[in-house]
Amino acid sequence: MNALSPALDLSPALVVLPGPKAGAADGAGSRLLSSREAERLAARGPVVVAHAALTARRLGLQAPPRSRDIFDALELYAFVRPAQFCAPSAAGLAVALGLAEPKGPAAQAQALADVCRMLLGELAETPWPSREEALALAETLSRAGWAWAGAVVTALRSKAVKEGHRGSGLDVWTRVSEWEDQAPPGESGSTPVEPEAARARLAELLVRRGLDEARPAQAEFAAEVAFAFQPREREGEPRMMLAEAGTGVGKTLGYLAPASLWAEANGPAVWVSTYTRALQRQIDRESAALFPDPAVRARKAVVRKGRENYLCLLNFQEAVQAAQLGNGDLIGLALAARWARASRDGDMTGGDFPGWLPTLFAVGPAAQASAANLVDRRGECVHAACPHYRACFIEKTIRASRRADLVIANHALVLTQAAFDGARAARGLKGDIESTALKRIVFDEGHHLFDAADSAFSAALSGAEAAELRRWVRGPEGRGRRGRGLEARLLDLVADREDARKALGEALHAAAALPGEGWSGRIAPPSGEASPIGPVEQFLTAVLEQLRARTSERGGGPADLGQECSARPALELVRATAGKAARALAAVEAPLLALARRLEDLLDDEADALGGAERARIEGALRGLDRRARMLLPAWRAMLQAIEEDAEDDPDFVDWFESNSMFGRVVDAACRRHWVDPTEPLRAAVLSPAHGVLVTSATLADPTLSDPFALAEMRTGAARLPDRPKTLRLASPFDYGKNARAFVVTDVRRDDARQVAAAMRELFLAAGGGGLGLFTAIRRLRAVHDLIARPLADKGLALYAQHVDPLEPGALVDIFRAEADSCLLGTDAVRDGVDVPGRALRLLVFDRVPWPRPDLLHKARRERFGGKGYDDSVARARIGQAFGRLIRRADDRGVFVMLDAAAPTRLFSGLPEGIELRRMGLVEAIEATAEFLGAKATE
């Protein structure tokens, strides 16, 4: 019996794997169950599971609400080990607790029961951060009806505790550390980094990592990229370098070596930017070689994301207050409070927050303790007026990044921050106080820089965006909504300034013309009878009219991608409503600009009287006003005015209309404008102001070109600089001829879902699992999943799928990594985010060539950048990037399969040296896969 929780011994552990295949474990041992037996066990309760919603889905049931009879072990883990990683499955829990990976549902059920006992024992011995604090929250959870509360309270009371009032434990904002002001760091210096010094620093880092010496290619990389850390000689001409380093070269430590030397000699900071969260986390881990002491590392290497990624303590407090009144998920919030107390930086999206936590039970989206509800997504921060300002995770991260040696950021943040700084500089203002100057930048995953720039420097007027602007100005208008409008944020600051109050009132009045509550149902109702309110909704309704008149659904149906058409020539109705919408936006823009000027005057007129808190509030408000009144609204009006005037197309831009669909019906419409070549604003905002820029990736060069870096220069903006960048190309040290195979299957019809599914099923079985299937369309992914999930389960292989399983891609990849014989289906997001070394990923199958989608934007770029050759380059790069996911270590083996007989051989020229592409029938490919990977398993 378990002294900490006798009930646990009486509650069977249930695991349901894809297929479904089920197993249970209790005092009598572990056993396999039929689906019907598993359903009865789940319905009867009490039962221990790992991810209740996913378990129910696999049994064909609805996700259950929380119940005292459903013990989700993942919630117990989140309480006992807050802010610690765990893949959200029974096997993931076992691995997290140091157990061997259990194979099959019965073994996983037994492991699940063992894990729960281990966690309760751990809690009894060493509760974090203190027994009293954990007990306060546990008692609150008990009153809220948490299934685990009895066992948790028993474990915590197994040793003496102080009696008396402990509070709810939910007020985490009173217990997180506060930041302190420090003197400004000053301007960065220009001391160069010598190549030999970079080599020496790399050697030091490798010793700290327990390695004897640098690989020759890694040492060469570190020495060569020191070029990007030399002083620039002329304004607008950065030291720019493009460096391709194949998988296994060790480029991360290779560039951290000179970057750390530059930061030590010159002051803050080198910005290291990535495209994916996975690499951001990896670089953060690698920085431990630079700063082995965790306390020093916390100061010197700071992970920085946009404000919308971090827990807002004021939002959390308001959510707790609402939940205590019955309007929210109090149990989820209590577990989030445990996490917030332990979190390194409060990052809820890709940090140490368990993103699977809000998805375990059937909780309405608006009530979940999720990032969507708890971060500052709407720009409503009141800055110094917030009672939690000194404890704010966002402010702590911002201040830490100002003094750090390394700021580990992402492309989106770096580009939008640079664009904002550029806009302020054009008005003679200093850059944003929320960042240090972007003087030295390393863009890792540089092959994504073009796409990141395309997103950062584009404009989109949609119903959702316009409604968000209305909320930002006017605040929440529906019942039960949380949020703060301009008046709530600023009225007390401008109370004695009549001109500012007048501008504020005019902005509130004008914003009423923007889409309000229920706008989506008015512009695109199921009945088809639109009833728009206001000029912006009328314009969007007209946009939908033009879309219906000129297009058919793209992507095979409205439930997939919606529709798109060129904005010009516009329907007369579109032109007329565009003009009215432009004037409505101008009416919002003018008072916002006036308010910004009044706030700037306030900073100037009362410079000697304003306290630091008041100044911070005003500067924060000005940042929000600048982004909307000086950047967003002018961009929207420019699009609308061009449509109203039916002006000729600007050769530098592509304007188009599109609709977005969900569950088979249109839910939004948008007018979009993108640069044909977004590297022009990239150059102006990011490259030219910088002093040194390193762009690196394992797949930058195109070996089919006479100049392998010509395309990379174009797609990174380097071609727009006065001087050509320095280039470097280092091959992977891996023996791909020995460790990898690449096949094109010639007898599978790619348009026949049954044939594709059969091929993928047999290849996964031949590999014994560890297969990743990549699709270019969600519809085909779902069709294949439905056809192969059960047959794979019958053979003991679990199949997970993006857009099918109710988990975000990162969580699916975590499970895939933890369960070495599982398989995963995904699209681009999975391809770019997969970092799975070892046998867990040993087979990669493409359903077809990943050509770029032939939309209007791609058509314009195709014409600009080389026609068919441009298509080839994009597809070749995607294939190369996917192949790079397959072999991550020198001892990995993997098979790459393309199920598209029409795939041109030229698209595979970017694969590493030593790879021989073979074309063969499916049967031969299955046999070759089994032989190659089977040989590895028996070595």
Feature names for model-found ranges:
Residues 234-258:
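Walker A/P-loop
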Residues 371-402, 407, 418-430, 588, ...:
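A contiguous, basic/glycine-rich beta-loop/short-helix subdomain that forms a polymer-engagement track
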Residues 778-803:
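Conserved helicase motor "Helicase C" RecA-like lobe of SF1/SF2 P-loop NTPases
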Residues 733-751, 804-904:
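Conserved RecA-like P-loop NTPase helicase motor core
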Residues 192-204, 268-269, 274-405, 412, ...:
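A substrate-engagement module of RecA-like helicase motors
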Residues 190-243:
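Conserved pre-motif I regulatory segment
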Residues 89-159, 896-898:
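Acidic, Mg2+-coordinating catalytic module of metal-dependent nucleases/exonucleases
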Residues 11-123:
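Conserved DEDDh/DEDDy metal-dependent 3′-5′ exonuclease domain
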